[in-house]
Swiss-Prot record:
Lineage top rank: taxon: Bacteria
UniProt KW Iron keyword: yes
GO molecular function, one term: iron ion binding
Annotated organism of origin: Shigella boydii serotype 18 (strain CDC 3083-94 / BS512)
Cofactor requirement: Fe cation
One Gene Ontology biological process: quorum sensing
PANTHER family the record matches: S-RIBOSYLHOMOCYSTEINE LYASE (PTHR35799:SF1)
Keyword Iron: yes
Protein name (record): S-ribosylhomocysteine lyase
SUPFAM superfamilies (UniProt xref): LuxS/MPP-like metallohydrolase
Intrachain S-S bonds: none
Length: 171
């Protein structure tokens, strides 16, 4: 099986919260697509609570679009990582990491402004697969933590696993 890009970086050296360009590619028509690793938690040391991360998933996608879309950038999707340490964001365009970090912080400020669980988008049986698994309080705790710790930039060059280590891991 081919090695996915996300498994070629050393998760033991990854900082959080931090932005990292996980992948760049071009469509057959030449449009640039960038995938960002938005790391909320230090891998293997922290994890987002499931209810809070689910609520954040509903809020984060819209708020990030409000702050990042435009000037050659359009978000395609923001999806939570299965390990619950962050989100992947796929978009058209090539914004630099600092622009993404600034939008992320602004989105976290927006999460803190949500006053009631009823303001969570698509929070109903028709539009959400587990509509009862939400916590606005946990989502706001996550947002507060991001803002208190600030958002850094993770460098692929600094996190790259050496080829010897990949071979040792039988990858």
């Amino acid at each position: 099986m081919p090695l996915l890009d996300s498994f070629t970086v050393d998760h033991t050296r990854m900082e959080a919260p931090a932005v990292r360009v996980a992948k760049t590619m071009n469509t057959p028509h030449g449009d640039a697509i960038t995938v960002f690793d938005l790391r909320f938690c230090v891998p293997n040391k922290e994890v987002m609570p499931e209810r809070g991360s689910h609520t954040l998933e509903h809020l984060f996608a819209g708020f990030m679009r409000n702050h990042l879309n435009g000037n050659g950038v359009e978000i395609i999707d923001i999806s939570p990582m299965g390990c619950r340490t962050g989100f992947y964001m796929s978009l058209i365009g090539t914004p630099d990491e600092q622009r993404v970090a600034d939008a992320w912080k602004a989105a976290m400020e927006d999460v803190l402004k949500v006053q009631d669980q009823n303001q969570i988008p698509e929070l109903n049986v028709y539009q959400c697969g587990t509509y009862q698994m939400h916590s606005l309080q946990e989502a706001q705790d996550i947002a507060r933590s991001i803002l208190e710790r600030d958002v850094r930039i993770n460098s692929n060059e600094e996190l790259a696993l050496p080829k010897e280590k990949l071979q040792e891991l039988h990858i």
